[in-house]
Amino acid sequence: MKFALKSLFCFVLLVSCSNLFAQNHVLNNVLVARQKGTGAIIKDNTVTGYFAFYELDKKDKKTKNYQLNILDQNLTPLSNKKFSSQENLSAMEASYNGDLIMIKFYDSKEDKYVFKTYDQNAQQIGSKSLDAKKVARSNAMQGNSEEGESSTLTPVEGVGFIHAVVKMRGGALSHSYNEITMIPNSKEAKGWTWTTSEKSEDFEMGDVLGVNSKYLLFLETRRHKLMSRDFEDFILGIDLATGKKVFNNAVEDKKYAVSTLNAIANPGGDFQIFGLFFEKDAKTSKASSLGLFGFSVDTLGKITTRKYQSWAKDVSKFLKVKANGKIEDVGYLYFHKFVKTADNKIFAIGEQFKTNTGASIALSLLTQSTNQNMSIEDMYVFEFDNTFDLKNVSVFDKSRSSLTIPGITGGARTTGLFLYYMGAFDYSFTQLSKDKSKFSIGFVDYDKTKGSKGWYFGSINYADGKFKSDKIKYDTKATSQYVYPGKPGYVMISEYFKKEKKIEFRLEKLNF
């Protein structure tokens, strides 16, 4: 079993139970199955069904065959659609936005993306193409793999889908820029595309931070030279209806250098952004951080409040932390998500990682390489009040897993990002309840020793101011396993058996 798959597992768990027995469904003649080809159909934070899109066994070398299946919340088949395409058209990822299912394809002959939308009866609603000629090669085939999948689609409920990629102005080492496209649900609605100014000479990357009723919030990370470790963050706000830029402001601070990690979009149109802060002149990709920051941002993109929680002064009240942000006997934390509950408490969900120094030295001597031996361990939840003062840190035990990565010359932040993009972490999701009074954290872990088939999925539930956790262990001969949202009290497990060319879906009851 390959470690890159498990970080892409995603499941939602809810606390009430509505069925005492698990349901099952089997899909046969499956040539290729991807985690992003299956997803939950969710209404009002409740799973009402599933879509499953996969490649069927080929009938000839020039044609690919696909099938889209729609299932209800009990895995009962509702509808399906089979279709064929030329060999040059490859499925990359699928997404659901509360109304439609979008499937993204890459046409290698024309070097373009093709987006097709389907309703919940598996009937095609629309189609759109976008040029992929200038897309960075690391992005161009993103998702076209059974491993290490990542997403370029962001669903926007009631509106459409956001597609975001990095493009090159010239060759492979030329300046890069972000391109963001809104593809609306309706053919009558007008989509839009936003790109960086053609005059920009920066090297840019980007990521969608959040969406509310008014704006898309996008993080632009810029550097002036290709190999520079001096990054600058900009918060871009785009009007969802028009695609026009509302603001594009640098995330700056008079006291510190900062690096943005995450954001929370508030219903009124404003945002809260979170990240790490450093010494003022530090190069954020390499330096050790001083702690976490929380800033409030208004509807014009201006920072209105600033709060800092340092490792040495604040976090050390709950954990033994060194001044460089390294937790004693633990290492560092990679923060996956920040969430806000109905009572305005803020929770930061992190996962432990560290370098196994002795193992790395032994590996280097043995292989004459600069590889690093890393370990991924426990889950951490930081609890803040509504002013971003740290109130508690909870630690949840998780099995230790080891892996080897190429040598990283940057600091803990760069190493954490590298592990994230490799899919090395066990974290899967954080899901708020409809009233935002409760949330669940999901993770999937298993023994990464070669040949091992033992794995488990775990959950951390927060309700009434308290945490509860659960783990369920399994032994399986499947090639890969994925976990998805389930009806109340359940998760849906998908197991892909490559040799047998089949996918087995089943619902499993949780111990809550």
Where are these regions (language model features)?
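Long, internal scaffold/assembly segments composed of regular secondary structure
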Residues: 209-219, 227-351
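Loop/turn-rich, solvent-exposed surfaces of beta-rich toroidal or solenoidal domains
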Residues: 275, 292, 335-355, 369-383, ...
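Structural signature of eukaryotic scaffold interfaces centered on beta-propeller domains
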Residues: 33-47, 92-98, 106-108, 142-159, ...
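Conserved blade-ending motifs and adjacent loop-strand segments that build the rim/top face
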Residues: 248-261, 307-332, 390-428, 462-490
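Short, conserved, GDST-rich strand-edge loop motifs in beta-rich repeat architectures
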Residues: 49-61, 161-174, 219-230, 276-291, ...
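Beta-propeller blade signature
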Residues: 65-73, 115-123, 175-187, 230-245, ...
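Bacterial Sec-dependent N-terminal signal peptides
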Residues: 1-27, 512
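Post-signal peptide N-terminal segment of secreted/secretory-pathway proteins
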Residues: 42-158, 163-170
